[in-house]
Amino acid sequence: SLGILNPFWEKLRLLHAGFSTDTIRIVHIGDSHIRGRILPRTTGTLLTETFGAISYTDMGINGAFCTTFTRPDRISDIAALHPDLVILSFGTNESHNRRYNTLLHYRQMDELVRMLRDSLPNVPLLMTTPPGSYDSFRKSRRRRTYSINPRTAIAVETMRRFADDNGLAVWDMYEAVGGRQRACLNWQEAKLMRPD
């Protein structure tokens, strides 16, 4: 699916080689992982240091689902930035629903992608999977206990299937940070996991 990004890679190559001076615009939308700004700012800074003229705009909302961005005004805001790449980072909040439904999640992603493609028909879309999360349970009146959210892995599979079915590139952050066995533990040990 990375071939979908070839036009974007070519723009980066031309910029890096000095054959282009056009600013490359990346818009990254998503949930609290984007709202927290650590990931998008680090990514944007590294890209700018490497390639030069990069505009990296993050639009993160705590508690966001992919449907949070299916409002016409939000799609217009994204389109007004004239992006060369749109990155979609969702899945954490969808998977926190104890009645998580793969079919519903698939349909919601489809609605967002259709709206983006209607407004930005030639812009490649890159989907990232969530990094893993914990479920919180009340053990007693004053104590809570936490366990790894088992629905994250299901949401990741749904997202990968959707991306494959619909021609989106995917960066599987869930697997990159440790997958079902280690994603949460690795993030927690690195002090990258924060409470919402």
Model-identified regions with their sequence ranges:
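Residue-level recognition of beta-strand->loop/alpha-helix junctions
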Residues: 58-60, 129, 172-175
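Alpha/beta-hydrolase-fold catalytic nucleophile elbow
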Residues: 89, 128-129
